[in-house]
Amino acid sequence: QDGKVTVPHEDFLAKIRAVRYAFLELGIEDGVIVARTDSLGAGLTKQIAVTHEVGDLGDQYNSFLDVEELEPADMNHGDVIINHHGKLVRPKRLPSNLYQFRKGTGEDRCVLDSITSLQNGADLLWIETEKPHIGQIGGMVNRIREVIPNAKLVYNNSPSFNWTLNFRQQVFDAWSE
């Protein structure tokens, strides 16, 4: 089972809005909200997002779920079924009651997390990745800045990363191409 577990965006955004409201109530004019995302390495979610219409934030979040399409006759007692764009789908649910994301969706989820956090009250975004990869980080920053050109972004320069080894590997990979 994957280690990191996310929650739907609306749950996280409610916390950002609560902090912003607390600043207003307390008269704090220079408070800074830092949103942190390390969803890139998360493969599971705690719950399915509430969605009201196609394309809303909940729908976008649920589109990352690992699902199987099924017919009504194939439904089992206790199944969780989603009507996704007119099709019935069953998200992959683990015995722990967590839901699994599709492989390869981490970067898209992280970019969506980042953009929605900044659009909903975060002043600064702290991005984490599973390893220091310049191309990956740069690509994510560019995608965020396409939507929010003045986004204030910081990166987790973790000493737990073996920076030298990772950069050597990236140079080697570039030479091999």
PLM regions: where:
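Alpha/beta enzyme core
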Residues: 1-161, 165-177
